[in-house]
Amino acid sequence: MEVTAHYIGGKPFVGDTGESFATLNPATGEVLAHIEQADERVLGHAIESAKLGFSVWSSMSAAERSRCLLKAAQLIRDHNDELAELEVRDTGKPIQEASVVDIATGADVIEYFAGLVNGLGGEQQSLGSNQFFYTRREPLGICAGIGAWNYPIQIAMWKAAPALAAGNAMIFKPSEETPLSALKLAELFTQAGVPDGVFNVVQGDYRVGQMLTAHPEIDKVSFTGESGTGKKVMADSAATLKPVTMELGGKSPLIIFDDADLDDAVSAAMVANFYTQGEVCTHGTRVYVQRAMYDAFVEQLKERTEKLIVGDPMNMETQIGSLISKSHLEKVLGAISSAKESGATLLTGGFQVTERGLEKGCFVAPTVFVDCRDEMPHVQNEIFGPVMSVLVFDDEDEVIARANNTQYGLAAGVFTQNLSKAHRVIHQLQAGICWINTWGNSPAEMPVGGYKLSGIGRENGQETLLHYTQTKSVFVELGAFDSPYA
């Protein structure tokens, strides 16, 4: 099988490094491609290419950059089905998700920042009749994007959009588990007229990430992944004082009060745990249900969860796809075993699905544990699989304290018909992304990011553009220079 490699300088690039790895379809075990592992020489070539691209791109007007990005977004939409199928084969997620969410929401963000950048300007202030100052928002230079495997192309677009809109170049490293869609994205950027070298893709494992974060000519790092790796990224970046944006792990609370709409609450809990087979950092895996609603909630949850369709991700009827890898499958099954050992009651699921031709994949039945306690390991630790923990609570103050008793702070949600209560509770929850009577919505206009160990900085929304620029202050003297020396 031919070795697929990198995308540097507006075209595919093979570095002849002598090392490669296989990327698999996790649903079937099929080898999709062999990918070249980048080395220092490949990264050096990418940086030189990015320098050239940056010199051209940053000198273009905001309107010119905007036109290129809008064209890229349209090309991405035109290739939606192709990109979605590629994403499904590489991730194992259902095609019904990828075809309507992953590609479209990435294109949304590119369009959003393409429109926003035209208004990116500085300020001017007079300091008297002969003096004034003004400021400029200037690009940082070369930004590194390090992606995750659960939403490969969406994450690539979420990182590239503000970086490129602000005039930067980017070197993007996809996860070695899902390396394919970023190459197609790079190709579409080139077709849209983005200058060569502005968006480059280098492939490889953690070693490539370490080279990027430590490199003195990388001016910023944006990372999506788990919190432990995020600490290492930040430490490596600190050596050259480069700014970082990090969207990390979570163990988010979903709080359901007894006046909530039962059907909506169950629907949200299912989406907040089983969408993308549970491999979403913002999932609400700690579901707190007020005692008066608990029994009815659990009864409906069991009935509806057992109707979910686990199957071939390429089948439009499939609702639960394959986990990303055999090693991750073992981790999730281990967490399920731990939950049983800790005394939680298995309501439904809890096993690997192997019938109907799924034996070669990494499928886990949607799993719900009840009678959970806050101190149980599966309640405290991020599992990143289709495993829900349901906990009962009695009053508002109690559930707020319990919901906040975690090292994470990525997301939180509240379901209640009392909007005063909803806002009162949300304002006390220690989380960066919050929802009221819904779960998971993430429009391009809304900044997203975490508190505590769930991240630093934000993605999307107006403030994100500021993370990809730096302020230059210019003081102007119109009169004679007033020297203190004779």
UniProtKB/Swiss-Prot annotation:
Involved in the biosynthesis of the osmoprotectant glycine betaine. Catalyzes the irreversible oxidation of betaine aldehyde to the corresponding acid. K(+) 2 binds at L241, K452, G455. HAMAP family: BADH. SUPFAM superfamilies: ALDH-like (SSF53720). NAD(+) binds at G147, A148, W149, K173, P174, S175, E176, E226, S227, G228, T229, G249, C281, E382. InterPro entries: Ald_DH/histidinol_DH (IPR016161), Ald_DH_C (IPR016163), Ald_DH_CS_GLU (IPR029510), Ald_DH_N (IPR016162), Aldehyde_DH_dom (IPR015590), BADH (IPR011264). This is Betaine aldehyde dehydrogenase. One of its GO terms (molecular function) is betaine-aldehyde dehydrogenase (NAD+) activity. The modification Cysteine sulfenic acid (-SOH) is found at C281. It comes from Vibrio vulnificus (strain CMCP6). Its cofactor is K(+). Belongs to the aldehyde dehydrogenase family. Transmembrane segments: none annotated. PROSITE patterns: ALDEHYDE_DEHYDR_GLU. K(+) 1 binds at T23, D90. GO terms for biological process: glycine betaine biosynthetic process from choline. The active site is at K159 (charge relay system), E247 (proton acceptor), C281 (nucleophile), E459 (charge relay system). Dimer of dimers.
